[in-house]
Every structure is written in C-alpha cells, then in structure tokens.
C-alpha cells in the first residue's frame, strides 16, 4: 500500500485496521438531503408532539405508543444539523468529545427507538383487528406507559456503549466522529444495526399480512374505507423497507468484502462506503414520514386540522374570534360528533374493534 493510501484511507481505530474515506461527493449531496429531512421532520414531529401535549385530553394505550414514536423521531431529527455540519466539514468534527458521543448515541438510540415503537404500533393494530377480544387490547394507560419505559430502557441499554467510546478519532489533520467504520472485526453496534431491521421487518410484514388476510376473510375489503386502510397498511410496510433495506444491504456487502478481502486495499471499499452513507440518510427519512402514521392512526389529528381550518375560515369570514370552545375539547368531546373517527380509538379500550380503526376518516 502506498503512502497516499495510508494517509487518506487507512486508519487504526482501537488497535483495529480500518478504512476511512472523506469523499467530496458526500459534502455536495448529503447536507441538502439532511436539511430537507430536518425541516419537514421537525415540522411534522413537532406539530405531532404539540397536539399530543396540548390538544389531547384523553389518552389511550394506542396514543401512548404513538406519542413515544413521535418523541423518538423528534429527538433523532434534532441531531441532523450536527451531522450535516460533520458532512460539510468532510468528517472533521469541531465540537469536542462529549458532543460527538452524544450525537452518535442519540442517532443510534432514537433510530432504534423509532423502529421499536413503529413495530409496537403495528402489533397493537394487529391485535385490535385480528384478535379484537384479546386481553392485550384492554391494557390500561399505566401498563402502556410501563411498557414504553421498558422499551426505552432496552433501547438505551443496547446503544449506551456509544457513550463510553472516546471520540473523536484523529484522522490526519481531521477529527473523525462516526460510529460506522470499515474495520476487520466484529462490532456490537454493527450487529444491532442489522438486527434492529430484520426482526421488526418480520413482525411488521407478518402483522400487515394477517390484518389484510383477516379483513378479506370477513369480506370487509369491499368497502371503500377498508380498501384505503389496506392501502395505508401496505404503504407503511413499503416505506419501512425503502428507508431501511438499502443501508442494510450495503452494510452486508461491506461485511462480505471484509471477510474476503480484509483491509489491505482500502480502495476496494470506496464505492460501498459512499453508498452506505447515502443509503443511511434514507433511514432518517422514516422519521420524517412517521407523522403520516400519526395522522391516519388516530382520529384526533385529522379532526384537529379540520377544526383548525374551519376556525381560520370562520374568523376570516366574520372577522371575530370564536372563543366558545377550545380545540382540545373538540378533539375529545362527543364521539358522535367526531367525523369518521375510528371506534377502536374513540371507544373504551375494552370495547371490541371496529374496522374504521385502520384507516383515514371518510372524506
């Protein structure tokens, strides 16, 4: 290996031989992509949390899981500006050791948390549709909150190792802040990156397939609302695959190259390393798109926007504010006045499932 390769690509990390690249293409492409994901993700998840915190007066287990999904997505999204800066500077971290560890930990923890709670939402929907009288459909808010805390504890436990690793790593004249390096050794972080995709993928696909099959067995898929619900379920699964599968496939390719070629010639990894970080940016897109799940999974969100738009139009026409009722009361008032609200969410948690739980409200 010549001196140019040694200086630019080869790096020893924790006594392991690694290949590290600082590609100019990443500087040009990824910051704008992350910028868009940050803007739309911040708006969508920020608005979702605002509705959860200030415009919902009644909580159910399903909403508690959705709230935790929104928290995970929001915490991931707010880390993206620091990652953008890291890319713009060509992997030259300028904020020191502790901020680097925190950023890597937050990205990993909340990516994993987002996947876990998205999976929990799918499982919750599965039991309400396929097993409407199962005991899991009757869990209290307290139990749902305890389950959420346990899941957060597991997520933190699986990613806390990133807080223990000294960062950044000296790479020539630059400070490398990255949790993904091409090293010829097994890493727990790498294994979890693969496991956190394949296990939830299997669960989400199983739940989605069983829900669709159950509805068709009952011949409910003939109704227009149920058809839209089935389409929505399929879209959620497809978006999950599109966002996470590419980076997993590329990472598996890197593992294969490490097994067959080692790290003697780092040039072998230039293209796959670039492909990995491009596809890794797709995973953050999932957190940007998750607010769509909130919108279609609970009647409160479409009802909130409908109420907000109607009020704005009313104020514009009359020129007088309407202070008679608060938005939060309208969201949690008489279920009979809630247009097209999914009954499984609006009713008590112990009541049987209604097919309208699955999909968007009627136009």
UniProtKB/Swiss-Prot annotation:
UniProt region (Disordered), positions on chain? 319-363
Q: Which domain of life is it from?
A: Eukaryota
Q: Which InterPro entries match?
A: GPCR_Rhodpsn, GPCR_Rhodpsn_7TM, HCARs
- Please indicate the ranges of residues that lie on the Extracellular side: 1-33, 85-102, 164-192, 251-273
The membrane-spanning stretches of this chain are 34-54, 64-84, 103-123, 143-163, 193-213, 230-250, 274-294
**How does it sit in the bilayer?**
Multi-pass membrane protein
- The disulfides recorded in the entry are 100-177
GO BP, one annotated term: positive regulation of adiponectin secretion
Q: Which Pfam families match?
A: 7tm_1
- Please provide, alphabetically and separated by semicolons, the GO molecular function terms listed in this UniProt record: nicotinic acid receptor activity
Q: Where in the cell is it found?
A: Cell membrane
Q: Which GO terms describe its cellular component?
A: cell junction; plasma membrane
Q: Which UniProt keywords apply?
A: Apoptosis, Cell membrane, Disulfide bond, G-protein coupled receptor, Membrane, Phosphoprotein, Receptor, Transducer, Transmembrane, Transmembrane helix
Residues modified to Phosphoserine: 328
Please describe the organ and tissue distribution of this protein's expression.
Expression largely restricted to adipose tissue and spleen. Expressed on mature neutrophils but not on immature neutrophils or eosinophils.
Spans within the Cytoplasmic topological domain: 55-63, 124-142, 214-229, 295-363
Q: Does the keyword Coiled coil apply?
A: no
Q: In UniProt terms, what function does this protein have?
A: Acts as a high affinity receptor for both nicotinic acid (also known as niacin) and (D)-beta-hydroxybutyrate and mediates increased adiponectin secretion and decreased lipolysis through G(i)-protein-mediated inhibition of adenylyl cyclase. This pharmacological effect requires nicotinic acid doses that are much higher than those provided by a normal diet. Mediates nicotinic acid-induced apoptosis in mature neutrophils.
Q: Which family does it belong to?
A: Belongs to the G-protein coupled receptor 1 family.
- What is the protein name given in its UniProt record? Hydroxycarboxylic acid receptor 2
Q: Which organism is it from?
A: Homo sapiens
